[in-house]
Amino acid sequence: MGVAAWRRAARTSAGAMIVALAVGCGSDSTGPDVLDNGSMSAKIDGASWSATTAIAATYNSNILGIAGTDAAGRSVGFGAAVSAPGTFTIAVTSPANGLVNEAGKAWQAAGAVGSGTITITAISATGAKGTFQFTAAPVAGTGATGNKVVTEGVFDVTF
């Protein structure tokens, strides 16, 4: 693997790890009221979804990770390397990714798997807002099948 390919893989893996951690930490019922972190909603396969149980958001060293969970335990998250507002494409050469988790089954858009965009309209040391949409492929070994299509995603979060 060449140096450029290794760097792309490392950035994508780091972003995916941030999203996974945010999704996992977002459902901690013993922690603070993370709904104070803002709002997040989207459509998953055409059905409305809203983070009603937990929202976790982090921004450190220009890496943004945001995830939310609804009352049924369905989680949506995404991450990207962000230093300023803009649109970030989920693709092989991009350190951006998206994730859906339902009942332990996982779908991911990262690198060569899936596609989509994350648009950051505002970002600061205290919060971020924007939109997201992606098509996520099933993660092997989780029991997930078919793709998950996330559209009309909107977020407004604080860190």
Language model feature labels by segment:
Residues M40-K43, S48, A54-G127, A137:
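Surface-exposed helix/loop patches within compact recognition domains
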Residues T119-F159:
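C-terminal or internal capping secondary-structure element at the end of a domain, subdomain, or sheet
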Residues L21-G24:
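C-terminal motif of bacterial Sec signal peptides marking the signal peptidase cleavage site
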Residues G31-G38:
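Short acidic, Pro/Gly- and aromatic-enriched capping/linker segments at domain boundaries
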Residues D36, A72, V149-T151:
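A short, structural micro-pattern
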Residues G26-S29:
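Bacterial signal peptide processing site
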Residues M1-A14:
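Bacterial N-terminal signal peptides that target proteins for export
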